[in-house]
Amino acid sequence: YIEQGNRVLGILGYTEHSRGHAVKVAETAGEILEKLGYNEHTVELAQIAGYMHDMGNCVNRVDHAHSSALMAFQLLREWKFPDEDIAAIVSAIGQHDEQTGTAVDAVSAALILADKTDVRRNRVRNPIKENFDMHDRVNYAAVASSLQVNVEKKVILLEIELDEEICSILDYFE
C-alpha cells in the first residue's frame, strides 16, 4: 500500500512518500518517545503508527489520514493486535494530518513531529524549481536537519538549515 501510494503521489506531483519516508517516520517517532522515557510498548505503538501513517495515499491524497487509519485498523485486526493497541495506533494515524487532526496523546504527538520533521532534498520529485509547491520548496531548501529531545528542559528542538534563496524559515512553518 505504501509503494502504491507513493506512485500515485508521484503522478500527482507530490513529494516522495515511499517506504523510506515510512521507516524514517517510524524510527523518529519511536526515538522521541524512547528519549522521553516512555515504555517499550508505547514506543512500539508509535513506530507502527509511523510506518503505516501514509498508506491511505493509495486511495486518495485527500483525507489520506483517515483512509490510512481505516486500512491500518483492518490489517491490525487481521494480525490479531489487542483492541487497545489498535485504538492507539489508528487514533494517531487519523490525527496526523494538520488540516484535520491534532495531537491527542503521546503516540499521536510523536507521529506528527516525526512526519513533519522529515524534510530532505531527495524527497522532491519535481525537477522544475519554478513549479515547486510549498512542500517541494521546503524539502529542496533543506540542507541539513536534526531533531533533538532535551528531557531535562522538556524541549523537542528541530534544527534545520535552509537555503534561504529557495525558501525562508517562515515558509517552513506555513
Please give the residue ranges for each predicted region.
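Inter-helical turn/loop segments and adjacent helix faces that build the functional surface
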Residues: L36, W79-D83
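Acidic/His-rich, divalent-metal-binding segments that scaffold phosphate/diphosphate chemistry
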Residues: Y1-H64, L75
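Post-HEXXH active-site segment of zinc metalloproteases
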Residues: D63-F73, D83
